[in-house]
């Protein structure tokens, strides 16, 4: 690409079934950078075989204890050669549409100060196939290599590293990220909830992780933990115009006035929280 070298990078563990396909779709990029975090299913051996035939394939195996997604992602990003300008970070079960590079080139030519590109994701095993605006946030996985880092131990996301200048994120409806999720793969809700609880104990003001924990309590109908967690979210979240904030406000008001099972302590906590932010 005339706007600089490119690299697709991601982490994996025991995902041997996806390696060949991911490498095929990532072939147009200058580099393919894969971090194996402890596979035991033959993934690492297969990667070594491919790397022996592909000078643009950079691989490493490293385990992390304790596990944090952002730490692994940061390490993976650091593996990307320093001369790379644009990075793409599709998971191993995700593939960018074949028009991605040419579309990026046109977009960057038209908007030279762009720092990241968001796109729609197609979840082919989901009832809601297209993930993108206006109903959902688009996927932000295309970014300048030198200007972003990974943040949050779970449900990690890219974060702008500069304080003296602003990022410029551009949405492109011509690029698609296809999510070919393994419907047979066992989900890991217990691990995720454990990590969210640990983060909440260490850093109760981290509203990014707290939101997912609140949502888990809500779905589980666990009022005992939901109410104090939701109240803390409203207390610490600075964006009072967000949908998350407004939805929690409405739900706590409804609980306060209509939920018959609330005890006096729960009602008092809700009232104090609502009074403090109105």
Which residue ranges define each predicted feature?
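Short, well-formed alpha-helical segments that are part of the catalytic scaffolds
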Residues: 9-29
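Catalytic-site signature of metal-activated, phosphate-bearing donor transferases
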Residues: 69-77, 96-225
């Amino acid at each position: 690409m005339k706007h600089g070298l490119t690299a697709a990078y991601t982490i994996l563990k025991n995902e041997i079934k996806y390696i060949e396909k991911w490498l095929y779709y990532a072939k147009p990029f200058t580099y393919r950078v894969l971090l194996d975090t402890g596979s035991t299913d033959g993934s690492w051996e297969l990667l070594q075989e491919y790397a022996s035939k592909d000078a643009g394939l950079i691989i490493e195996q490293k385990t992390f204890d304790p596990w944090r997604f952002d730490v692994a992602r940061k390490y993976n990003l650091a593996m990307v050669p320093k001369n790379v300008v644009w990075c793409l970070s599709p998971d191993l079960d995700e593939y960018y549409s074949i028009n991605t590079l040419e579309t990026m080139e046109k977009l960057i030519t038209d908007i030279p100060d762009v720092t990241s590109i968001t796109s729609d994701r197609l979840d082919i095993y989901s009832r809601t196939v297209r993930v993108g605006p206006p109903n959902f946030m688009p996927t932000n996985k295309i970014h300048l290599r030198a200007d972003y880092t990974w943040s949050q131990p779970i449900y990690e996301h890219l974060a702008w590293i500069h304080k003296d200048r602003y990022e410029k994120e551009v949405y492109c409806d011509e690029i698609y990220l296809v999510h070919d999720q393994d419907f047979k793969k066992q989900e890991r809700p217990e691990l995720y909830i454990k990590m969210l609880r640990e983060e909440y104990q260490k850093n109760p003001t981290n509203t990014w992780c707290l939101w997912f924990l609140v949502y888990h309590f809500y779905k589980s109908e666990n009022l005992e933990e939901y109410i104090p967690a939701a109240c803390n979210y409203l207390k610490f979240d600075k964006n009072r115009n967000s949908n998350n904030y407004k939805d929690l406000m409405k739900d706590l008001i409804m609980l306060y006035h209509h939920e018959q099972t609330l005890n006096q302590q729960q009602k008092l906590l809700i009232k104090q929280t609502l009074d403090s932010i109105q």
